[in-house]
Curated annotation (Swiss-Prot):
It comes from Xenopus laevis (African clawed frog). Residues 293-305 have a biased composition (Polar residues). The gene is foxp1. Residues 306-320, 515-527 have a biased composition (Low complexity). One of its GO terms (biological process) is regulation of transcription by RNA polymerase II. This is Forkhead box protein P1. Residues 568-578 have a biased composition (Acidic residues). It is found in: Nucleus.
Amino acid sequence: MMTPQVITPQQMQQILQQQVLTPQQLQVLLQQQQALMLQQQLQEFYKKQQEQLQLQLLQQQHAGKQPKEQQQQQQVATQQLAFQQQLLQMQQLQQQHLLTLQRQGLLSIQPGQPTLPLQSLAQGMIPAELQQLWKEVTGSHTADDVVCNNHSTLDLSTTCVSSTAQPKTSLLLNSQASTNGQASVLTLKRESSSHEEYTHNHPLYGHGVCKWPGCETICEDFPSFLKHLNSEHALDDRSTAQCRVQMQVVQQLELQLSKDKERLQAMMSHLHVKSTEPKASPQPLNLVSSATLSKTASEASPQSLPHTPTTPTAPLTPITQGPSVITTTSIHNVGPIRRRYSDKYNIPISSDFAQNQEFYKNAEVRPPFTYASLIRQGILESPEKQLTLNEIYNWFTRQFAYFRRNAATWKNAVRHNLSLHKCFVRVENVKGAVWTVDEMEFQKRRPQKISGSPTLIKNIQTSHAYCSPLSAALQASMAENSLPLYTTASMGNPALNSLANAIREDLNGVMEHTSSNGSDSSPGRSPMQGMHQVHVKEEPLDHDDNDGPLSLVTTANHSPDFDRDRDYEDDPVNDDME
C-alpha cells in the first residue's frame, strides 16, 4: 500500500513564494488534503487496532491472568471498537464530501494517476492569501496534535506519532490508498496562455527589476527573477516583517482613500445642491472685451474697483468717491450675474454647445447663454427650422438638466423672449402656430450692445482672440481656488493678482484711446474726466441664478435703442422665482 506524497518544507515555501494558486484552487486543495490526512490516520489506526486485538487474544490465552486485568482489557477493547465506529462514520462523511466536489467539477479523481507535479500549478495569489494558507495548514497540524493528546488513554500514541511525524510545514498532495483500493489525485487544469500572461504581469516583477519593497534587484529575465525571489525572499522573519509593513501601508492608503472619497462626495453634493444661506458667486469671471470693469452693487452704491497705474504713462484714478473695494457683501446684495460671452460678440453657440452637450444633459448647471440664443439654437437644430412652443419646451428639458427641475419658472421667460424679440417670427401653418428665426434680425441685434466710435468697436472685436484664452485661464484659476472677487484679504492671491493686472492693462488701453479722441476730450481734460466717457452697462439679474457666472461688458456712448434688444428673461415681471 502506497503512502500519500508529502511536500517538504522547502517545497512548501516554493509554492507559497511562486504564488501559483488561485483562492478557489487553494480552498479545494486544503479540503482535499484534510480528507487525505484523515484517511491516512484511519488506515494507520486500523493497523494499530489489528495489532492490539492480536495482542489481546494472545494475552487471554495465558492461564495466569487475573480476572481484574481481563475486565480492564475487555473495557479497553470495547472503547476501541466504539472509537473505530466513529472514525468509520467520519470517513464515510469525507468520502461523500469528495464525491460532491467531484460532481461539481472542482475535483478530478482518476485512478492510477501519478501525483500532481508542482510545475503544473499556475495562478496568482496575493500575500494575504499566502498567510491565510499558511495559518490553515499549521492549524490543521495543531488540531492533529490535540487529537493525539485527547485519545492517549486509548493507546493511540503510535497512530498520532505516525500521523504527525512530518513537520508542520508539510502538505499531502496525493493519496494512493482508499477504502475501495482505488487511488485519487487532485488535478488542476491550466492553459499555457494564462501562464504567459501571469509571467508578464507578476506584481513583484517589472521592467527587469524586483519590486519587493526595498529590494530593486535587477533581474535579466523572469526565471532569474524567480530564482532571486526564492533565494532572497524566502519565508523567514525578515520577509514576514516586510509583509506586515506592507499591510500597514495598504491599510493607511485605504483609509486615506476613503477619506478622500468622502471629501469628494461632500464637494460634489455642495456644488450641486443650492445652499439656503447667501454666498458669493463660485463661477469665474469672464472677460469679453478689452475694456473690462466689474459690476457694481447697485446704481445707488458708491463702491468701485481700485485702480492703480501699471504704467507711468497712463495713470488711473478712482472713478467715484467712497470706498474703493468691492467686498463679498456687495456681491451678496447684487446676486449672481450670468456670463454671456457667446452672445456679446457673435461667438457661435453651436461650437460650445456641441463640446459640452453631454455635460449640460447630466449636470444641473445653468448654460451660459441667453434665452434668445437657446431658443434660436433649438429652432435651428429642428429639421424644418421651426418649432411650436411645446417643442421648444421639450428641447430645453431634453438638452439641459438644469431646466428639468423647475419648468414653471423658466417657461414664462421663454414665452416673454419669443414675444418681444424681433428675431423670432410667429407663423401660422397646418401644425398651428410655429416659431422661426429671422437670422438677419438676430445678427443685427448683437452689435447694438456696443455703439459709438468704430475704432472702439474694432478694437473690442480684434481683442476677442486675446480675451478668449485669457478668460479661459482666469475661469480655471478662479474656479480652482474658489476665489471671491476683490477683497482686501484676497489681494495677495497670485490668481487675483494676474486678474488685476489684466484688468488694469485693459483699462489703460481704454484710457489711451479715450484721451487720443479729440472729439470726446479737450486738452485740459484730466484722465479722470476722460474715464467718464466709458459707461458700464449693467445687465439685469435673474434672481433664480444663485450660481450664475459673472459677465463684465463695457459700452461707450449708450445707444438710445439699446433697451429694445435686451434679454427680457431678466425683467422683474418675468423673474425666475424659485
